[in-house]
Regions:
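Outer-membrane beta-barrel signature, preferentially recognizing the C-terminal barrel domain
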Residues: 17, 46-95, 99, 119-129, ...
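Surface-exposed extracellular loop regions of Gram-negative outer-membrane beta-barrel proteins
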Residues: 1-15, 19-25, 143-154, 174-198
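Transmembrane beta-strands of outer-membrane beta-barrel pores
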Residues: 1-4, 42-48, 57-58, 89, ...
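Conserved C-terminal beta-signal and adjacent last beta-strands/turns
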Residues: 170-293
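Residues on the lipid-exposed face of transmembrane beta-strands in outer-membrane beta-barrel proteins
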Residues: 26-30, 81-87, 131-137, 152, ...
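Outer-membrane beta-barrel strand-turn architecture
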Residues: 22, 30-34, 77, 87-89, ...
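Transmembrane beta-strands of outer-membrane beta-barrel proteins
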Residues: 24, 38-40, 91-95, 131, ...
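Outer membrane beta-barrel strand-and-loop segments of large Gram-negative receptors
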Residues: 74, 80, 93-149, 158-176
Length: 293
């Protein structure tokens, strides 16, 4: 249940929205054998506009870009279905489908010549379907463990702009790889890479992005001390590049901030976990003796 009310500081601009809906969730699981497990789930969800989406005031970023909220936004409702298969707890594949009515996305409109006004609006439909595959704890050699994730997503957005029916649909590949290396009992390292392909996002098209992270760790003083040296976005390839096209509007965003981070972390453990567990166990035994159990 939801209830919105407010005033946009303009005469005769009061607004009220009331709604009542049910949001069921169903999850089923079937074990064919001890190694093969099938899962099926369905859920209906609501996404409400946040404060910034409803704020009627305009923010001026520069001479070419203004952004504001939209007091006429409605909540969006989505139906989500997933069918999954799990093999021996290390391999999982999932087929998913989602249909959203009144999806809340940013819209881009031309105002007064070359100025772009950005505001959220409800798109008439948004359909997402795809497949997700995950393999965990693969071990090519004794000191090397790998987690792999591959996702294929097809996004299909539909809306009406200036009387024209518009669509933005695209297939997007997503890959993730996490490598863990245990060279010795005290030396270890991690290497991860994540890639997002070209993606449809409302009226916008987001360009591919890649991020590579690396870290190395050393344990010292009988494993009480841990020193970690790490680097994020090693090749500085995780930047935002977006194309926007709609009737009367063609815009390009290319933000290339340097997101590379090099850091060092130091951790000291003052008491071993095994000693803590043993102390807790001793207290439990003493308490049992005290009450004569």
């Amino acid at each position: 249940h939801g209830d919105f009310g407010g005033n946009t500081q303009q005469k005769d601009s009061s607004f009220t929205t009331n709604y009542f809906h049910l949001f069921p969730t169903i999850a089923l699981q079937y074990g064919l054998t001890s190694e093969h497990l099938f899962q099926l789930s369905y859920g209906r969800r609501i996404t409400r506009p946040n404060y910034g989406d409803l704020n009627p005031f305009t923010y001026i970023f520069d001479d070419y870009t203004h952004e504001g909220g939209n007091t006429k936004l409605h909540p969006s409702f989505s139906d989500n279905i997933e069918l999954g298969y799990v093999y021996r707890d290390w391999f999982q594949t999932v087929l998913f489908f989602s249909h959203t009515d009144d999806a809340i996305m940013k819209s881009y409109r031309e105002q007064e010549g070359r100025r772009i006004y950005v505001m959220p609006q409800n798109l008439s439909s948004y359909v997402q379907t795809g497949m997700r595959v995950h393999a965990a704890n693969l071990s090519p050699v004794s000191f090397w463990k790998v987690n792999l994730t591959a996702i294929g997503i097809y996004n299909n957005y539909g809306w009406t702009e200036q009387g024209q029916k518009m669509k933005n649909r695209m297939f997007t590949p997503i890959f993730g790889c996490m490598n863990q290396f245990a060279f010795t009992s005290v030396w270890s390292a991690e290497l991860s890479a994540n890639y997002n392909g070209r993606m449809a996002y409302g009226q916008a098209t987001v360009h591919p992005a890649l991020e590579v992270n690396v870290g190395i760790q050393k344990k010292m003083f009988r494993n009480r001390c841990t020193v970690t040296l790490f680097a994020k976005d090693v090749f500085n390839t995780n930047y935002q590049k977006v194309d926007i096209q709609s009737p009367g509007v063609q815009a390009f965003v290319d933000e290339r901030h340097n997101k590379r981070v090099l850091g060092i972390a130091f951790a000291w453990r003052f008491q071993k976990g095994s000693e803590t567990k043993e102390s807790r166990r001793k207290k439990e035994i003493d308490e049992t003796k005290r009450v004569n159990l």
